[in-house]
Amino acid sequence: MIKKLVLVFIAVFAIQCYAQEGTASPYSFYGIGSLKFKGTVENRSMGGLSIYTDSIHVNLRNPASYATKNIEGWEGSRPIKFSVGGSYSSANLKSTSSTDNTSSTTFDYLALSIPIGKFGFGFGMVPYTSVGYKLESLNSNDNILNRFKGEGGVNKTYLGLGYLITDGLSIGVDAHYNFGNIQNSTIEFAYDGDGVPLLYQSRETNRSDLSGLSLNIGLSYKTMLNEKLELVSGLTYTPESNLTSKNERAFSTITLNQDSGQEFIVNNIEADLSISGLKETELVMPSQYSFGVGIGEPKKWFVGAEYSGQKTSDFSNALYSSSTTTYEDASTISVGGFFIPKYNAFQGFFKKTVYRAGVRYEKTGLNINDQSINEFGISFGVGLPLGNGISSANLGFEVGKRGTTNNNLIQENFINFQISLSLADRWFQKQKFR
């Protein structure tokens, strides 16, 4: 039944989500797009906290989680773990002069973890960045001066290995292949003396096809402080890496359908970027690290805190450079936890439900018009038990804000809804009959 459910979920949900833009944030205009949260709905519902690892949930942030202790009462075995998730986001965009509403639906992750002895293997796919915006600048007569549009993003596929060094200490490494494309276009509008748009307008289009490799190293440690309390800690490190960007630029004369906004190319000229050295460029992906610690009672409750940082100040993108934009080091502080009323209850569905909550504060590393772009979010979630008791359907909710209206910028007030299936089972165990 679980296998059939997985197939239906992938076919219906993931395909539909890929047809949508992964973000509708105007801040995805900068760099290589808005950085996507790399983590499960379980993590996201605890303010992004990812240090907690166990034998029945996939952890996308720390590859050491692939090698965990056995489940008590399962005859010394660890299950295969599968997880797939997605989200819907709605945002109110506010400036000093206007407001607008946007929404987006996105596939967030597909992951599988397989234990073999003291080793554990993991592989899957997650979005890394996402671009999706449509912006307009106006003149004093409220006529459109420029229209900016962007789409695309960078995805990650990964293959990881974890090793259980001792009963509570594990180490792991992920190898990532990063790939994707980003397309940005700018239309410059011209008007006649009466303020009527001319028949022909000018458009510049830039496209980048990106690819590269990266690593993520993780360490996880758990130990019992006494008969009830358990200490949990973890750390990760992602070394600096490069993305190769193969670029194209074109200048077009277009006409516009005033009703639908559809663009029709009249004339198109491909720019020779090799002259300026922009035909193929290398983007430096900054190093990143995280560490955290928490305490709790196994299968009952947990609370923890985590800090992550990234040397975003090392990032640059020659093709999309802007004099008003700089990059500074990014960081995130997450605090959260979970509570389970009665994990082994024979009756009472909500007694076995996992209740999660958390809060996070993030410095995105983006500085526009001398204004740092920061983000704040409060999250809640539940894990609803399924079938064998170690699988669950997870629902998450987050409300928060990004950016500011200072210095002619935009503030986003957003609401995010997340859903996932977290499935665990011993697929290769032989059945016994009496």
Stretches found by the model and what they are:
Residues E21-R434:
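Subset of outer-membrane beta-barrel
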Residues M1-S25, R434:
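Bacterial Sec-dependent N-terminal signal peptides
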